[in-house]
């Protein structure tokens, strides 16, 4: 996207979607109408399957406007264009049903699915053939030539494909002023693929998966030996297949000497245990025992502070164990690592550098939104909340207890409590009136850094909750802070 015309203003757009005002129209333009000028390569002959990215990064409540994007009307060269929500994805070859079932529960498959659900609402793709030889390439569309002066028309010399977007009445000029639009934009994840080759003996089949500082193991991508034999985490028969494969298992720690990483993890477990069980001592009537319990709480607070200050940036190592090998040889393991919370809050506009040679121009690689969503591995207490949600709800949110358990699973120790109320609001869809809502009030123990983090938390939680809930559940999420 090179240029955009919105609310009587002509903007120049760079590769980070930042807009620079070029000129103001001399006459009024149609309301709720945006023109997008595309610089299209000569080798591209059709706009079919081109995905457009739309965002309102400066609006705190942008979800209701993203929800209405499928209601927009698109056209090029005076001809309407049929659009569908979501980014274009190539269709994959069908897999054998058993393997496809287990792959759907793979860690990376689950993460990729969640990321796509978060960003699909930003994308609209062209779902019909739009031959470019039927669309005139011009510096300004004919409908706008009379709106700008001769000076502006002389500056606009590049031949562009102009796409017209008409928004619903819910979009005011102030809202459209915050619109960012672009193409050639894709969701990215903070992960790095490692490849490690190890020589193994038949009697010792343990492979340490190395990670660097601030890195954590995310998932194992593939395991193969020198004979070309593949290894999987689960053993399942494939009907009609003669392929031979083995199995492996992943273990965290237990194969190395006791070091500072083990000490920090063990102290964290001890603190969780003390926090959970200290209240039992207060129920005893003995004054001496209660005084000792008070001293123990003070020592626990000091111990927690000392644990937080331990400068250990490496996690407890993981080990891949081959269950059975036919003979000794080399095993090649590919696995993903991530930087967890360290990769959060990288601001929009930051230039990116590719790790390897790509077919893309490195000068055009940049973030168009702030990164968020990275989490550390759950602590022991948070694991209990995750197990509780999985056992009670089975991945579906139907009751208020399910909503509270889901929020606790997502936010962990940051969430003090969840208050859920029934409410009513005016639907953003023009044909609907008042709709019932579920108002989720999140009471946090620690204040977030700013409105942008609150917006990211609301959008992420809203998307994840909606994906697990019935279509009749309309959520409104509010963030409050514990004053106690």
What are these regions (language model features)?
Residues 1-484:
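Intrinsically disordered, low-complexity, polar/charged repeat-rich segments
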């Amino acid at each position: 996207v090179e240029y955009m015309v919105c609310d009587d203003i002509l903007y120049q757009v760079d590769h980070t979607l930042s807009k620079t005002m070029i000129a103001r129209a001399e006459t009024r333009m149609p309301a709720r109408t945006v023109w997008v000028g595309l610089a299209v390569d000569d080798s591209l002959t059709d706009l079919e399957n081109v995905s457009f990215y739309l965002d309102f990064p400066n609006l705190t409540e942008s979800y209701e406007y993203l929800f209405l994007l499928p209601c927009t009307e698109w056209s090029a060269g005076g001809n309407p264009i049929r659009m569908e929500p979501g980014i274009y994805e190539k269709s994959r070859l069908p897999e054998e049903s058993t393997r496809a079932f287990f792959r759907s529960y793979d860690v990376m498959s689950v993460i990729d699915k969640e990321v796509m659900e978060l960003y699909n609402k930003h994308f609209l793709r062209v779902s019909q053939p739009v031959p470019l030889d039927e669309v005139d390439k011009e510096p300004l569309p004919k409908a706008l030539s009379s709106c700008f002066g001769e000076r502006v028309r002389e500056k606009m010399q590049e031949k562009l494909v102009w796409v017209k977007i008409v928004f619903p009445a819910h979009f005011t000029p102030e809202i459209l002023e915050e619109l960012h639009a672009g193409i050639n934009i894709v969701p990215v994840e903070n992960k790095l693929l490692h490849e490690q080759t190890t020589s193994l003996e038949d009697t010792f089949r343990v492979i340490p998966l190395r990670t660097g500082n601030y890195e954590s193991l995310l998932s194992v991508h593939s395991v193969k030996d020198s004979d070309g034999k593949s290894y999987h985490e689960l053993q399942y028969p494939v009907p009609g297949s003669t392929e031979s494969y083995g199995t492996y298992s992943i273990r965290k720690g237990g194969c190395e000497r006791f070091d500072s990483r083990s000490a920090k993890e063990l102290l964290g477990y001890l603190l969780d245990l003390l926090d959970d069980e200290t209240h039992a001592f207060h129920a005893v009537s003995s004054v001496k025992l209660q005084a000792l319990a008070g001293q123990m709480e003070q020592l626990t607070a000091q111990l927690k502070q000392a644990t937080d200050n331990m400068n250990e940036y490496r996690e407890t190592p993981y080990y891949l164990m081959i269950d059975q090998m036919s003979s000794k040889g080399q095993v090649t393991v590919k696995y993903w690592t991530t930087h967890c919370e360290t990769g959060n809050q990288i601001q929009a506009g930051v230039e990116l550098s590719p790790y390897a040679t790509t077919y893309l121009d490195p000068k055009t690689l940049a973030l168009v939104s702030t990164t968020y969503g990275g989490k550390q591995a759950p602590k022991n207490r948070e694991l209990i909340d995750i197990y509780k949600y999985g056992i009670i709800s089975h991945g579906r949110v139907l009751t208020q207890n399910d909503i509270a358990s889901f929020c606790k699973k997502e936010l962990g120790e940051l969430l003090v409590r969840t208050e859920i109320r029934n409410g009513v609001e005016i639907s953003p869809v023009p044909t609907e009136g008042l709709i019932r809502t579920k108002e989720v009030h999140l009471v946090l123990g620690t204040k977030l850094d700013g409105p942008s983090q609150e917006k990211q938390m609301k959008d992420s939680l809203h998307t994840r909750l909606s994906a697990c809930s019935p279509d009749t559940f309309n959520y409104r999420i509010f963030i409050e802070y514990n004053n106690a």
